[in-house]
Amino acid sequence: MKIKLRLNKSTIESVKADLIEKHIEISEDANLILTEENYAGDSMECRNETGVVFVNTESICYMESIGHDVYVNTNDKRYKTRYRIYQLERLLPSERFIRISNSVIIKKNSIRHIKPALSCKFYLTLTNGSVVDVTRTYYYKFKEFYGI
């Protein structure tokens, strides 16, 4: 059995030792991922036209789901990831990322402008120039976080 680890630096060595002792192989190309609850990873596995790349989470502006595909958008590039939006919501640290609709997660400090709209919505202009909307489902959570 192969497992990919997504653990904080404080616990990774002890978990690795336990898994190796139990004859479990640790590999980056494994289908199973063991993720710590408060894992604050610094990079995310994505794909572009040349292959697999690791995108630094600090450079991410927002992530969006379009159909069955999930895209990671930085200020200047767009990557595809195999993670689903609900997985990214759990994987990424909630101190830096917030879900604003069923299909979009933004980095909290990537907002350039907030424009209120009718019927419990906001339109956000992000640092890369994209405009995304906070839907009614996530409206109050967004307002509470930013103190609006």
Name what the model sees in each region:
Residues 2, 6, 13-43:
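Short, well-ordered secondary-structure micro-motifs within conserved domains or adaptor modules
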Residues 32-127, 131-133:
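Conserved binding/recognition cores within well-folded domains
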Residues 5-8, 132-135:
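Active-site-adjacent beta-strand anchor residues
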